[in-house]
Amino acid sequence: MINSNMTETKIESNIILIYISAPNQDEATSIAKTLVDEELCACVSIIPSVRSIYKFKGQVHDENEVMLLVKTTSQLFTTLKEKVTEIHSYELPEIIATKVVYGNENYINWVNQTVRS
């Protein structure tokens, strides 16, 4: 429940959240460290176990995967996507983004200051 004394502030944001699935923890960690090291994102949260059910090349797959939640700016999406495609083991890696509309202003500022310009 939201406290009636609290106000919700919508701030303009160029921050996006990118979802990237990986086949295992080692690859997820490697991708995350590369993206942070190259300043393509400010932070990657790794969710160690997700179950993905999908159809690929005519077959239904049921796989355990690791999910990366990448915090970056919309300006870096294309460069980040190209880097992930280059280093990812999947033929067709999941790289999808959603825009952050609401957020902690200090966190949004931190993301912008942390990634490359």
UniProtKB/Swiss-Prot annotation:
GO terms for biological process: response to metal ion. It comes from the Eukaryota. Coiled coil: none annotated. Gene3D superfamilies: 3.30.70.120. InterPro entries: Ion_tolerance_CutA, N-reg_PII-like_a/b, N-reg_PII/ATP_PRibTrfase_C. GO terms for molecular function: copper ion binding. It holds the Pfam family CutA1. Disulfide bonds: none annotated. Belongs to the CutA family. Homotrimer. This is Divalent-cation tolerance protein cutA homolog. It comes from Cryptosporidium parvum (strain Iowa II).
